[in-house]
Every structure is written in structure tokens, then in C-alpha cells.
Amino acid sequence: LERNPIFWSCPMSNKWLIDIVDSDFLMHDMFGPARKYGYHLIQTEVTAIDRDKKQVRTAHGSIEYDYLILAGGIRYAYEAWFGNDRVAADYTRKNFPTAYIPNAEHLALKRKIRNFTGGTIVMTLPPPPHRCPPSPYERACIMAWWFKKNKIPAKIVILDPKPNIAPIGMGFRQAFEELYPDIITHVPNAKIREVDPFNKKIKTEAGDFTFNDAILMSPHQASDLVWMADLIGKTPEDKPTGWADIHPTMLHAKADPDVYVIGDSMGAISPLFGHYPKSGHVANAMGRIVAQYIGLRLADKEVKPILPDNLCYMLVNGEPREAIAVKFEYNLRQDGLIEQHQYDIDLRSADLVEEDFVWAKGLYNDFLSA
């Protein structure tokens, strides 16, 4: 069940903003692969999930299931800023789009960058966890490169709720200071207190800011599908965490062993580090892992934990094209906890750009080749 008529790749889409890749590179047909691999693809909108009846209701009718996999990604949590003020939320979404969900926001953001003639662009970063943690910094770099190339008198102010740039902190810091010292300003500990989109003002714990234009990234949460299924976790204070409450290695919901949640909607999986990175690489790995789990269950075989890895490349310079990267590896300790090992590749290089394209094409060929 897929809402969108085509596949649009959020990974690599920052490069599309400055024409390093074209639309054909990001857009892929999904019906051809469905025919090739022998599964049914229905383009529809999910309207409700009834776990007691094992039924998913859609705009085209109801479907019963034995196993359910929820892979809906994220949703924007504008209510963290505006409460129930839908006017402010809708105004922000329309005028200061973030383009972290595949939709028309990407085109709106590209137009915003191309039409900008000068002034200050503020970019708010969501608090962790959020989709693709290093990508806002990459976006700032490629925007800065575009403005520098076209001699546009622009300033980019990154309001970061974290105390430090992460991940790939040194690599991004060097890019900011060496390539774009007069364009990019990174403000740490800038947790949002108040957003006034109508008057273009933001209050943070690091000070107050005004802007000519902005990319206002609200906090992220699990997709609507997880909320429909009533599988959102709770804090010790009994407040919603915003993310699915799942078994850390088996990946099914703690409340329902026949419902799996994969990709960016997943909640924390280890007290040692919290969440898996919400990346396309991890999401793809989780799809493969859960497919194996269900196959083993159907065959009445033992299901043993399988852990993913993660790999992200980030473009920081458009000419010459240079990237940095980060790798994550995971292992299961004897006490049953998942352990994370992070390796930042801070030295920007053209080789990493080539590796990025090899990675992306490999992933597309893995599940989108017809």
C-alpha cells in the first residue's frame, strides 16, 4: 500500500537542489519492480488500522493481514511550536518548507534557493532524533556554494538545538570555516522557544533571530500510520515519545508481535545510544531483515537477531565536488544490549562523491530495477 504514484528519493535530493543530479535520477517507477518481483502494489491512502481485527482500511476498501509492516517514515510535528494553531502551522509549511518528505516541498525549496537575491536565511534543525541527521548541514553547504558561485549576498544561520555539530562534526566545521566563512553561521544550543512565521522572528535559548527567508524544520515524529495503529511509545511521565515502541532486535511492536515498524518511524532500540540513524540505508536494511524474520516465522524456524549497518555521504562542495561521510556498525553485547560504533570521515574528497553515487545506484538497483 503506497500513497505516492512514484518513488522520489530523499537521499541525493539535496544535490538536486543545485542540479548535480536531475529529476530522472531521483524519480523511479514502482509498478515495474512490483511486476518483476511478483508483489501487489496498490496506490492508495491508509485511513485506519484495526489491530484487533487485523485489518487496514484504505481509500479503496479494507485489507486483512497476517503480518503488517509499517514503513511510513516521518511526519512534521508543528504542534510542538504552535500547539493547535493550524493557521500558523499551515503558513509555515507553505512559506518555509523543509522538504524532508517526498512531495511538492522539494520543488518549492529549489525555487526558494534559485529566487533568493540576498539577505539572511535561517535554518532551524529538529531536535534529535530526526530524519537523516547530517543532511541539514549538507543542505547548508550546497546552498552556500550556490550563493557563492552566483555572487548572491546571502547569510545562512543554522539554529542547532545540539551543543555540537553531529555527526561528522569536524568535517562540517571545516567546510563551514574554510569554504563558506562569510556565509554560514552555526549557532549551537539554539533550542526553539517561539516561532513567529508571520513576522519572521524566532526566539531560542541562544538568542533571538530575524530572517528574510527560512527553512523551518519542526521536530519530527513517526508517521501517521504508527499513530493510527496506537503503537507510539510512552515516556516515564506517560507522555507520547513520538516514535514507535518496538522490540529492539525483533523489530515488531512490543504491543503486537504481528506488526513490524521499520525505517524512520522506529523508536529507541538501545539505552546505550537511543535510536538507529533515521537514514535510507538503515530503512533498506530493515526491510530486508524483517522480510527474513517473517519468512522464518512462516517456516516455523528460529528467528535470530540480525543487525543493520549505516552509511551516509554528505556533499560539502560543488566545485570541486567533495564529500565527507559517516559509518555506523552495530553488535549485540552479551547482556543483550545493542552497541553502536561510529566512524566519521571528516576529510573531504572527490572519491567520497564517487562512492556516494555508487551507493545510491546500488540501492536503486536493489529494489527499484524493473
Please provide the spans of the model-predicted regions.
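Flavin (FAD/FMN) cofactor-binding core of flavoprotein oxidoreductases
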Residues: 164, 305-324
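C-terminal auxiliary extensions adjacent to catalytic cores
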Residues: 323-370
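A Rossmann-like FAD-binding core segment of flavoenzymes
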Residues: 36-49, 55-56, 63, 145-242, ...
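Residues at the starts of beta-strands that form the adenosine-phosphate
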Residues: 120, 153-157, 258
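A conserved FAD-binding loop/helix module that cradles the flavin
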Residues: 262-308, 314-315
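FAD-site-proximal beta/loop scaffold in flavoenzymes
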Residues: 86-115, 210-213, 217-283
